[in-house]
């Protein structure tokens, strides 16, 4: 999860987030090299008064600075497209959970079970227990099995929302009248926090998301107790 004064990304918990982190590092290195080259050229131009006459009109140079940026863009685009297709692909999910956004709470329905649905509201600050996080804790957590592909169906009952859990690499818009889907897969157990990431009204900041990823046997026990 996030911590105060954090500069980097949250620790990756899903294969998709691991790919996104690697892509971020890959792109950042390219940007760093380009910035270093530009600063070097600018410093040379500022510190020398000599002019190379052949560079005033050089077809070779113009060809290079046309082809080189195109090649760099390809190096950025190819891994980006790969991850984009990975995020959109859902293979044989073991569980489907329908998520509906409301002003200002989330409701969840486990479509593979009868009558397993609940609303999830933020816990007010004055009701927090020791160890719980302010503005991030909810009264009903979303319990899911770890290391298994889970399909999330996401929509909204009123205005635009966005269901986002950074450590899982998830951010999917909740649009009224439209059903979007995303894949949830966690490599380890734990609590993972997110929030609504689309400004949706005065209480937009008070729509937290808490996923509790547990081993399959614990999930089966929890689901049996909820039905």
UniProtKB/Swiss-Prot annotation:
Give the originating organism. Conilurus penicillatus
Q: Which residues bind Mg(2+)?
A: 198
Assembly and partners are described as: Component of the cytochrome c oxidase (complex IV, CIV), a multisubunit enzyme composed of 14 subunits. The complex is composed of a catalytic core of 3 subunits MT-CO1, MT-CO2 and MT-CO3, encoded in the mitochondrial DNA, and 11 supernumerary subunits COX4I, COX5A, COX5B, COX6A, COX6B, COX6C, COX7A, COX7B, COX7C, COX8 and NDUFA4, which are encoded in the nuclear genome.
Q: How is the cofactor bound?
A: Binds a dinuclear copper A center per subunit.
The record, for NCBIfam families, names: CoxB
Q: What's the protein called, per UniProt?
A: Cytochrome c oxidase subunit 2
Q: Which residues bind Cu cation A1?
A: 161, 196, 200, 207
Q: Which EC number(s) are documented for this chain?
A: 7.1.1.9
Pfam family membership, one: COX2_TM
Taxonomic placement? Eukaryota, Metazoa, Chordata, Craniata, Vertebrata
On this chain, the residues bearing Phosphotyrosine are: 218
Which SUPFAM superfamilies does the record cross-reference, listed alphabetically? Cupredoxins (SSF49503), Cytochrome c oxidase subunit II-like, transmembrane region (SSF81464)
Q: Which reaction does it catalyse?
A: 4 Fe(II)-[cytochrome c] + O2 + 8 H(+)(in) = 4 Fe(III)-[cytochrome c] + 2 H2O + 4 H(+)(out)
Mitochondrial intermembrane-side stretches of the chain, per the record, are 1-14, 88-227
UniProt key word GTP-binding:
no
Chain's role: Component of the cytochrome c oxidase, the last enzyme in the mitochondrial electron transport chain which drives oxidative phosphorylation. The respiratory chain contains 3 multisubunit complexes succinate dehydrogenase (complex II, CII), ubiquinol-cytochrome c oxidoreductase (cytochrome b-c1 complex, complex III, CIII) and cytochrome c oxidase (complex IV, CIV), that cooperate to transfer electrons derived from NADH and succinate to molecular oxygen, creating an electrochemical gradient over the inner membrane that drives transmembrane transport and the ATP synthase.
Main localization category: mitochondrion
Residues that, per the record, bind Cu cation A2 = 196, 198, 200, 204
Family membership noted in the UniProt record = Belongs to the cytochrome c oxidase subunit 2 family.
The record's section on Gene3D superfamilies has:
1.10.287.90, Cupredoxins - blue copper proteins (2.60.40.420)
Compartments where located: Mitochondrion inner membrane
An annotated GO BP? ATP synthesis coupled electron transport
The top EC class, named as a word, is translocase
UniProt topological domain (Mitochondrial matrix) ranges: 46-59
What are the alphabetically sorted keywords of the record?
Copper, Electron transport, Magnesium, Membrane, Metal-binding, Mitochondrion, Mitochondrion inner membrane, Phosphoprotein, Respiratory chain, Translocase, Transmembrane, Transmembrane helix, Transport
């Amino acid at each position: 999860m996030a911590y105060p004064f954090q500069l980097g990304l949250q620790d990756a918990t899903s294969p998709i987030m691991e790919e996104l982190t690697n892509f971020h590092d890959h792109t950042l290195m390219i940007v760093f090299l380009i910035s270093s080259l530009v600063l070097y050229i600018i410093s040379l131009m500022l510190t020398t008064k000599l002019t190379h006459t052949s560079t005033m009109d050089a077809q070779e140079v113009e060809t290079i600075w046309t082809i080189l940026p195109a090649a760099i863009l390809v190096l950025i685009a190819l891994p980006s497209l790969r991850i984009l297709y990975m995020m959109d692909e859902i293979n044989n999910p073991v569980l489907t959970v329908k998520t509906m956004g409301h002003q200002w709470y989330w409701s969840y329905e486990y479509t593979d079970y009868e009558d397993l649905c609940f609303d999830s509201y933020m816990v007010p600050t004055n009701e927090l227990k020791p160890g719980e996080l302010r503005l991030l804790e909810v009264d009903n957590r979303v319990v899911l099995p770890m290391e298994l592909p889970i399909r999330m169906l996401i929509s909204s009952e009123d205005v635009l929302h966005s269901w986002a859990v950074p450590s899982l690499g998830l951010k999917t818009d909740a649009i009224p009248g439209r059903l979007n889907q995303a894949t949830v897969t966690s490599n380890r157990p734990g609590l993972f926090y997110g929030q609504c990431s689309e400004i949706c009204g005065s209480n937009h900041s008070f729509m937290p998301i808490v996923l509790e990823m547990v081993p399959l046997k614990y999930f089966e026990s929890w689901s049996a107790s909820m039905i």
